[in-house]
Amino acid sequence: MTEPSPITLKGVPGSPYTRKMLALLRYRRLPYRLILASHDTPGLPAAKVNLLPTFYFPGPDGELQAVTDSSPILRRLDAEHAARRVRPADPAVAFLDSLLEDYADEWLTKAMFHYRWAYEADIKRASDVLPAWTRGRTSDALLAEAGKTIAGRQIPRLRYVGSNEVTGPVIEASYARFLDAFEAHLRDHPFLLGARPGGGDFGVFGQLTQLAMFDPTPMAITAQRAPRVFAWVGAVEDLSGLEPSDADWFAMDALPATLTAILKEVGRVYAPLLLANARAVKAGATQVETEIDGQPWVQQPFPYQAKCLAWLREEYSALNPGQRAGISEVLTDAGCEALIAA
């Protein structure tokens, strides 16, 4: 029997999306080859935009192509490899999985970026360690200089995620509420949508590898406030031994209240941001101005997140009338109904 060729990807441990996809590959039992790098790699094609992780898949001509964006890659792997899929078979439950993955990738990452570059202890940890993952065999002086360069590049980008003196407390309060809701959910359920992990779990895991396991300020908060969540991150790192079944997903007519509580946090903070950002992008505005959790929110428009909203609406539109009715009821209960409004 011929061994399957390993999937090649490039990434670093400090990238939440790299960690998301590595955990996914382990759970899927898909062989892979990780190149520990953050920049162009000799012998491999360059991506249009240098994002981590970068996957290298054979193109139609057999030549490798550089592919980025974790969510489409997750779906591609589900389409190409039938065993141990992470997308629920029920299209309505799959929609909820998409929403949770999107929330993790696009909102929880605000907490990750905010904590990493807003507090001195976290800035020092990141500046000291991030460059050492790819440039460890160098002098202390050069490593310190690399850390200063990374911090100097990343701290000004806080404005892109909406982190400032006004919005910082909103981000932190939202992270605390998410921890409380997820901690309560984990008392009875091992994963967001049942007894097997979905894309949303891997999205949340990716962000928590940094928030709960690397950056000192949110790490301390997580360990103290949500010990089950803290432990969950360590467990999800490698789920290759889990044996899932088709019956492990929640049924749409039996969603637990603890999941609704998590979705309410999505409706409270992420839904208004997605909607305001989409309006700003459509209008060609120079900044997003809205209110989130009773506080003013200002950030630069993000065209990618406008696409995220469009993709969610496309997925909802593809459901049959009964499935749409079920999703509409769940989202209304959670305060997310505006996401699917025409």
Question: What positions do the PLM features span?
Answer:
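GST-like domain detector, emphasizing the conserved glutathione-binding G-site
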Residues: 1-141, 192, 212, 269-342
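Active-site segments that bind and position negatively charged phosphate/pyrophosphate groups
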Residues: 189, 194-198, 233, 239
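Short N-terminal edge-element motif at the start of the domain
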Residues: 159-194
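A non-catalytic, amphipathic alpha-helix used as a structural packing/dimerization or gating element
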Residues: 92-100, 170-177, 181, 228-231
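Alpha-helical scaffold segments in carbohydrate-active enzymes
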Residues: 96-106, 181, 205-210, 235-238
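GST superfamily/GST-like fold recognition
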Residues: 192-212
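Divalent-metal (Mg2+/Mn2+/Ca2+)-assisted nucleotide/phosphate chemistry catalytic cores
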Residues: 122-172
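Active-site/pore-lining binding-face segments in mid-to-C-terminal subdomains
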Residues: 205-296
